[in-house]
């Protein structure tokens, strides 16, 4: 009987069976969307925020991050994850700025903020100007249409050449332009969804979790989410809908590295899971999953 180095008969097959891992998973090709960027490590960015505090850039988009104007209180998935990171790192003074989404990168580069703390995804254009933390959580895009899907949209390819709404500066906007859609951009998801509801645009591509919040808050609306449409691999892998991360100036390598270590610990110890559950999500949103249930 052949024995593996672990002393188990059958080698990898037995190990896979013990771990409850499907055998076909061993053949899965895994994708690394973002490699190491340690060129500037040794800078003082971590020491600076430990001493002077940190300014987080959020955008008022539920459920990612929200600002209650009556109490000036911040809440949301990204707000709570970033606060947990700050606590883990020992950052005592946490401040917020609330630029529009399209102004997040300019605000970071001008040093108005220290972190793009409204989650941001890797795409080729962004990698040229900022760096990214390790993964925090995951969600995907969804195509939104008038209820009943009168034009019979069946795939993202069907959006080519059509007028499609998206949030300005978003991964959805970049993808739609790349596939040849005529993109109408909006400053906020509220304006975007109102325009779709009122027929000013016929289609929108938006974050699935944003629509879920809208759907619960607006019973009887006339928008349909096409959950049966699979997200193309090129919108997920390097196309702007991979892992939800946080953004940093390229020179702030120590801060970014510390953030990434903190996120790894908080994902591992259940903190991120608890935050996701608080906003109606689950551990399914910790890793990439197929979007056509």
Annotate each PLM feature.
Residues 85, 108-109, 159, 196-197, ...:
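Hydrophobic residues within well-ordered alpha-helices
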Residues 28-119, 128:
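Extracytoplasmic small-molecule ligand-binding "clamshell" domains
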Residues 60-63, 72-88, 120-121, 139-194, ...:
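Bilobed "Venus flytrap"/periplasmic-binding protein-like clamshell domains
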Residues 138-145, 216-260, 283-293:
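Periplasmic-binding protein-like
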Residues 1-10:
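Bacterial N-terminal signal peptides that target proteins for export
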Residues 26-40, 79-88, 149, 163, ...:
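Extended ligand-binding regions for polar small-molecule ligands
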Residues 119-128, 178, 202-240:
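A ligand-binding cleft/hinge motif common to bilobed small-molecule-binding domains
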Residues 83, 94-158, 233-235:
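Acidic, polar ligand-binding/catalytic clefts
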